[in-house]
Amino acid sequence: MGNAKSLSGQKMASRFLPEEQAEVDKLFDVLSSSEGGVATGTFSLEAMKSHVKEALPPAMVSRLYNGMQRVKPTDRTLGSCRSVSREQFTAFLSQLLRGSCEEKGLMVMNMISAAEGPTKTRDVQKFTEDLVASVAHVLTHRHELRGWTCRKSEVPPDSMQAMVAQLLSEMKFQDGYKFQGPQCLDQVCDQAMIEEWVFHVPHVGVFLSVVVHRGLCLLGSSFDPSTLVPECLADQGGRFESILDVLSVIYLSSHLAPEHRQRWRLLFSTQLHGQSFSQLCSHITSQGPSLLVLEDRDGYVFGGFASCSWEVKPQFQGDNRCFLFSIAPRMATHLHTGYNNHFMYLNYGQQTMPNGLGMGGQHHYFGLWVAADFGKGHSKAKPACTTYNSPQLSAQEDFLFDKMEVWGLGNLLEEYEGKNKKSVLDSNPEARSLLEISGRARHSEGLREVPRDED
């Protein structure tokens, strides 16, 4: 470890391309310039805060500065200096952005606690809180939310805490146990634990890159926002407010294939299309892979990823790429177990089979179920969903909901174009006739939309 602390600035500089190193040097010259514009060779915390301005919260600026200042320079005469030298600046950025897990872990450790003595889990938790808050802050400040507007002016604290808890849940202690909550906060964290955490939780490194690239306006060309936040395609004249915020979108996107991360197309929303199961079916069928999200009346947010187009039929569909997830009150994903192939189910208008949308489990006992009698559903898991090993996702096993969204992922492939202009009742005459025979009202009649190519 000691060698990592004493690596020379020249060696660290070699990790950057020549044009990148020139940009790093230019930023250092700006930070280290006195009021007269003369470079002093070092810079202070105040100079860094003055440069960053409102782009990052002050707490994160201090953490970045502490991380730089604690890099041991090769010139030992600078070791007790309270300012940051060019060598320290370059070494910190090089190791944080381009270093190995060991080197990144060391820089993170330097940022976590500036005080002497052992680092405890509560220190890591506070660092993670500052990191998550800084990412949400800087993306908002730089206008890089890519269309994801919050229902409030900023990302809700509950969402930040859910993301923090999710990141910490992957931290392993020396006894092999993972972080379990407040009872772990006084446990000591060593360098090896932080290195392993950084390695197993890619979001830590990615979030730090966002803070540097967008907070310091450094090496911006090496960061593509679309790899982190998909573009929100929901052009409704500003009327639409998603259940999701930017942090939950980042979390979900990270579990998708690259081709599904670039843009998300709003297919259905109760806010825009009303409480209608036939409207839901007509908007989500033949649309390719999709993500459905619900918020029950108790505030729990959850849903599932459908790996292929939804089709109305009494058989299960989909494949083992499907998964269930929860967003609030905690973030988690639940992958297939291999126990069965009950990945996706969508049926309507039949008397002998369940009518509704389901994922996982079995008929009448789904891991996630939205009834055709819209606004009702269930999430049954005693002890867990057989298909996805998911717990109960909703607050109550049988739940009510008013908010639901379905997002098409990526571009709509040609094979699906032309299939999505008909009502589900038009394309499924059997469902239509059975609905009429049963005497049930056709709530969607008269509510048909203009075909998409005529908008």
What are these regions (language model features)?
Residues 101-108:
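A short alpha-helix capping/helix-loop junction motif
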Residues 78:
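Generic anion/oxyanion-binding catalytic loop in active/binding sites
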Residues 1-5:
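Polybasic, Ser/Thr-rich amphipathic helices
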